[in-house]
Amino acid sequence: MLNPIVREFQYGQHTVTLETGMMARQATAAVMVSMDDTAVFVTVVGQKKAKPGQDFFPLTVNYQERTYAAGRIPGSFFRREGRPSEGETLIARLIDRPVRPLFPEGFVNEVQVIATVVSVNPQVNPDIVAMIGASAALSLSGIPFNGPIGAARVGYINDQYVLNPTQDELKESKLDLVVAGTEAAVLMVESEAELLSEDTMLGAVVFGHEQQQVVIQAINDLVKEAGKPRWDWQPEAVNDALNARVAALAESRLSDAYRITDKQERYAQVDVIKSETIEQLIAEDETLDANELGEILHAIEKNVVRSRVLAGEPRIDGREKDMIRGLDVRTGVLPRTHGSALFTRGETQALVTATLGTARDAQVLDELMGERTDSFLFHYNFPPYSVGETGMVGSPKRREIGHGRLAKRGVLAVMPDMDKFPYTVRVVSEITESNGSSSMASVCGASLALMDAGVPIKAAVAGIAMGLVKEGDNYVVLSDILGDEDHLGDMDFKVAGSRDGISALQMDIKIEGITKEIMQVALNQAKGARLHILGVMEQAINAPRGDISEFAPRIHTIKISTDKIKDVIGKGGSVIRALTEETGTTIEIEDDGTVKIAATDGEKAKYAIRRIEEITAEIEVGRIYNSKVTRIVDFGAFVAIGGGKEGLVHISQIADKRVEKVTDYLQMGQEVPVKVLEVDRQGRVRLSIKEATEQSQPAAAPEAPASEQAE
């Protein structure tokens, strides 16, 4: 019989339910978590034995959204879900980042977490629910895991923090921050903000961590009742004698190698030291394992770097703790792009471009929470040559998607509103060199490229990556970390923003015991670094260009009456298609009568505007127009009088005498003056050639309505 065990608790304005023992009983652990009708089913499977020779922790986190959760059938050709979307990949990373550091060092058994969204309330985002589910399932499983963790979303509305705001509330919020941590410490922060102060951001982190304690308590209660026995796993015994022998051979040499400031030269020397040490030790004792020796060497390497930093000595590349690497900033580096920049910080370099398009170029995202249109696209590419390696080149990997989203968050707060700048904007960051913080280099490069493209961003933005080395109560916060300092340190702390405040904050902490005070020091040190970088960037370009690139489409806007929209579109889109082909422009019409004409050639745009004004012009009774015969019938002739309008000249209105045969007087394509006699309720136009000929006044083109044009 199925005997589900359920725990229910209040979490801010939401009710959360944890249920286990009902489904997936062959998995190591499974939990159904629901928050106000948004439900995520999370399973964990762990292998009891590690694969022979396994030298890393193979944790996989999969997050998948099922369209049935929202009562929909997939819109794809096969009518089923396919590869993970960008959003699913980002949430999988959001789950992975806080749980990964909580597995004990040396644990290399394969573990897989699968979170499946099975029901969704459009007001409750499933990401927090999935994070709570992963924490609960891992805690129940008995797998060595130093959790549970809690997770919370924090908004900032009317100068107040809001716990787990609804989707509607998020639209009003100046902050969207996700924080995860254990009972004692914060482990992960991911956020975007509308240029908020350091104190406000830190307050949000602390608020979220305090509020999520109720989640941790509920999971602990569930584990007491339904948790599986803890695995009898012990780390391999430390071989002190072997450690000492390896240290004697390699420590001083590695210490010298880490004084080489050039990354590639340093890596080559470290590799030589490691391979020579391993060869010598195996020659002395063939029973030794090369993987084990490699791990000991890595630990020595880590200790060399960390102890030097804690002792106040210069860093790997000779800098002090708060120094920024040398900067080189250039704009307009690519002649035919709409905007471009090359941003170099030490051995990290990004070639960034900005491309302008029309509303038609915006990306339509069919997401579980509903369809939305994204008019600001940010793509980050990390080719293998950027770190001097060979490798696969193709579709973006999880890391590239995550870094691209972080960089986008950094720039989003300063992007202009669509009503002021009606362009779709795509930024692409090509990482051409990398040695730490390429995502923050992408933020700096994007700000420069957007200004070079003439995009009226509200302020310049820059990003910086901070690091931390901590032993006991002794700690050092590092500015502008290298790749090695990220890898060997205890924290990766990325901050982007303008002179006025923070636009994005991402934090990943590998150890417990990071206090509010340490985070405060890191944020303040990051602010100084950010302002320094902005100062250098402003020397290259200190404001958006006054005009967009000559190669970018210019969008001209006019307004027409809503009842004229059908005339411009035509039957089945025939008129607007013909206009687009005739004028060589792109034309978009909105429901309120706003017409946007995009063209790289100003004359083509003016011609398109003139043609639209002709089509939408009102026909004036009693006025004479030039016309062209389009169709001849027994009872008269149909003529076009400009702007796609057609009227009938009855046989009795062709001449001032009796007409027996229309073709005796008119031929197809013939141009004749006509006078408007009447426009009936159906919009049909009755015309006269006879009366137009009798009158002496010259013919006129249709009068165009007054229009508003904005470039």
UniProtKB/Swiss-Prot annotation:
PROSITE patterns per UniProt: KH_TYPE_1, S1
Protein name (database record): Polyribonucleotide nucleotidyltransferase
Region (Disordered): 689-711
Residues annotated as domain S1 motif: 622-690
Assembly and binders: Component of the RNA degradosome, which is a multiprotein complex involved in RNA processing and mRNA degradation.
Needed cofactors: Mg(2+)
KH domain boundaries: 553-612
Record's catalysed reaction(s): RNA(n+1) + phosphate = RNA(n) + a ribonucleoside 5'-diphosphate
Keywords: Cytoplasm, Magnesium, Metal-binding, Nucleotidyltransferase, RNA-binding, Transferase
Gene3D superfamilies: GHMP Kinase, N-terminal domain (3.30.230.70), K Homology domain, type 1 (3.30.1370.10), Nucleic acid-binding proteins (2.40.50.140)
Protein's GO biological process: mRNA catabolic process; RNA processing
GO CC annotation terms, alphabetical: cytosol
